[in-house]
Amino acid sequence: MPFEDRWTPEVYYDILRGIHRLGKTGKRITVSSIGQEALLPNNRLRNRLAELQTLGLVDTNMLVTTAGYDFCGDYTQFVDHFLRKYGLR
C-alpha cells in the first residue's frame, strides 16, 4: 500500500514503531529520523506527533509511553491481523 494511502492508525503505528526502533538502536530520536523510519515528510510528521502527544501515546521527549506500547500491541494483535486476513495489507 503506498504510504500516502495509509490509514491514520497505521501511520500512528509506524511512528511509534519507528521511535521504538530508534531507541533500541541507541540512535538519536529526532523528527527527521522518525520521519525516515515511518516514511513521512517532516511537516506531516510534526502534526501526527502532536496528535500522539495529545492522545498520550508519546511523551514530550518523543518517547513511546506505556499507552503507546499498548496501542502497538493491540494494533498488531487485532488490526494488522484483520487487514492481513482479508488481503488488505
Where in this protein do the model-derived segments appear?
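A short, conserved structural fragment
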Residues: 53-63
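Short alpha-helical segments that sit at the start of domains
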Residues: 1-16
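Short, amphipathic alpha-helical interaction segments positioned at domain boundaries
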Residues: 70-89
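Accessory beta->alpha helical hairpin/"wing" motif in late/C-terminal subdomains of nucleic-acid enzymes
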Residues: 61-72
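Short, locally clustered residues in the helix-turn-helix/winged-helix DNA-binding domain
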Residues: 16-24, 57
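Short amphipathic alpha-helical interaction segments
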Residues: 6, 38-54
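Short acidic, hydrophobic short linear motifs in intrinsically disordered regions
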Residues: 24-37
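Helix-turn-helix/winged-helix DNA-binding modules
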Residues: 7, 25-26, 59
